[in-house]
Design a protein with these regions (language model features):
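Sec-dependent bacterial lipoprotein signal peptides
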Residues: 1-25
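Subset-of-secretome marker
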Residues: 27-259
């Protein structure tokens, strides 16, 4: 794994947590009034996530990625991501998180990331020695996770940006509850933050605008599912689905041995 790709990978977990924080909902009482404004539904998620303090998530990735060969984009053999999994835990108050990624179709690739005490530890056994590497975390992101007021301000600003366009979809059933369905777009420019992430993508992949769909319980607003459709130009499209659970359960996240 090249250094730009490894740096991008170590930043992916805090970014993912920030996105989850922006769009997760978990607040409540039995007489919660119905919400109709998609922005209000997402704003309720900030307060609810802070109230829960911890959560578990499990996800899958599907789709195909075609890398470039000989400088021609999209000419390589397709890599199928079906069966890939993502599992992790988040402790917002403790500013800690862990995630494990498995891609069976890519030589059994596995990756682990642990963010704790302002340090991000990364391990990708398929590359290098298989040991842990460490890098100072992005303090502003870690600090924002435990600051509801700041997240509310960031959310309001994000939803008003051009191209984001949050909107309501038809309500759906999610398990034993009815759920709001809200969609919005994360423009590629918001993800890349310039050219650094794009430059780190391998094989001529080109990140496009990401379509996000969320399911939020209507009885006591709480996010239960997320779906990200990630276009990669001629390199294909990847869908990542996440399901959140175990809100408020005890979580133990510590620096890895040898990290």
């Amino acid at each position: 794994m090249s250094r730009p790709a490894r740096v991008a990978a170590t930043r992916a977990l805090p970014a993912l947590i920030a996105v989850l924080a922006i769009i997760t909902a978990a607040c409540g009482g039995p007489a919660t009034p119905a919400l109709s404004d998609p922005k209000k539904i997402l704003e309720a998620g900030i307060a609810g996530l802070q109230e829960a303090k911890t959560f578990h998530f499990e996800g899958t990735a599907n789709g195909k990625v075609v890398l470039s060969l000989g400088g021609t984009t999209g000419t390589g053999a397709p890599i199928t991501l079906d069966g890939s999994t993502l599992i992790g835990d988040v402790d917002l108050a403790g500013k800690r998180a862990s995630v494990s990624l498995t891609v069976p179709t890519l030589f059994g690739l596995t990756a682990d990331v642990v963010a704790v005490d302002q340090v991000v530890y990364t391990r990708v056994p398929l590359f290098g020695s298989g040991g842990w590497t460490r890098q100072a975390g992005t303090g502003s992101i870690f600090d924002a996770l435990a600051d509801p007021a700041r997240l509310l301000d960031q959310l309001a600003a994000f939803l008003d940006r051009p191209g984001v366009a949050p909107k309501n979809l038809s309500n759906e059933r999610c398990g034993d509850a009815d759920c709001y369905a809200v969609s919005f777009t994360i423009p590629a420019a918001e993800v890349s933050g310039g050219a650094s992430l794009v430059a780190a993508l391998p094989g001529g992949l080109a990140l496009g605008d990401i379509a996000v769909t969320t399911l939020v319980r209507t009885d006591a607003p709480r996010l239960v599912k997320l779906s990200f459709d990630v276009p990669l130009g001629p390199g294909g499209t990847v869908n990542v689905g996440l399901e959140l659970s175990k809100f408020g359960d005890p979580v133990t996240i510590t620096p890895p041995e040898g990290g």
